[in-house]
Amino acid sequence: MELIEEIINLDEAIQGETRTEIIYTKSQTPSNIKIIVIAGNPGIESFYQEFVKVLNLSFNSKYDIYGVGHIGHCGKIENKTFSVEEQIKHKELFLEYLLKNKYGDKDRKDIKFILIGHSVGSYISLKVVSRFSEKFEFLSVVNLFPTFKNLYDGLSPFIKMVVMRESTRNGLSTFLHYIPSIVVSNVLKWILPSDESRIAVQSKINYYSALNILYMAYTETEDIKEIDDECHSVFNSRLNQLLFIYGQTDSYTPKSFYDEMKQLYPAGNIEYSSSYVPHAFVLHHSQEVALRVSEWLSLNILKN
């Protein structure tokens, strides 16, 4: 099984930029179902290498599986920052790119997408389904440690102080940029499961990626308040197509968020992960989460 890393250029620009970095595995047999993993924040797709690999193996390479990060988080786009709204648009453009350039636009009516969103990637996925269901066919949305409600409340006091002010965002980004590469490498060795993912992530960490990560976090706190009408609309119309996995000790999505969802949608597929799995599950627990996702999708969405 080969994990492919690719730099693509979208057919439509956002702030004049089209560069998008993706990872993917290809199916061994033809299938019209495509699985899209949408990153959280940081929106660096390389963090999801192990998760995509395990998904591919658990599905016996039946489906093309893509991991896509966020525009501006690759560290190669200078002097521009992108909001969470622009990241939603970016994912629409990415799906459009796939249909036109990977699968042939004439066959687009046959292509069906499953979206797997982590953290704010869940919020982005739900918005994409809400806004673009007439353009694309969606079979399911899997919401992993989802932050579609009151994101600001889950931030630590230090992070709140950093992200809410432009001066502190710039200052921290500058500081991170000048940390010696050997220090960054050693930190990544400690937190990432493989040399492959460590090298890929390290190549994208600089002032510009840090500034985009922090700016996007700021716009998340501004945009993500109570569960909004778009999210509720998707929940009400597609509840049996949705899976929600919450963390038991996740400060971004405390127990009250889980309880609220269970109360509002008692028939929903809303569950907890194991107690030791953190919000940033991709660092050390990709296998467990990927196996649960593939199990649920196989039993509920892909059973035919």
Curated annotation (Swiss-Prot):
It is found in: Lipid droplet. The active site is at 119 (nucleophile), 250 (charge relay system), 279 (charge relay system). GO terms for cellular component: lipid droplet. It is an enzyme of class 3 (hydrolase). It holds the Pfam family LIDHydrolase. It comes from the Eukaryota. One of its GO terms (biological process) is lipid storage. Keywords: Hydrolase, Lipid droplet. Disulfide bonds: none annotated. InterPro entries: AB_hydrolase_fold, LDAH. Belongs to the AB hydrolase superfamily. LDAH family. This is Lipid droplet-associated hydrolase. It comes from Dictyostelium discoideum.
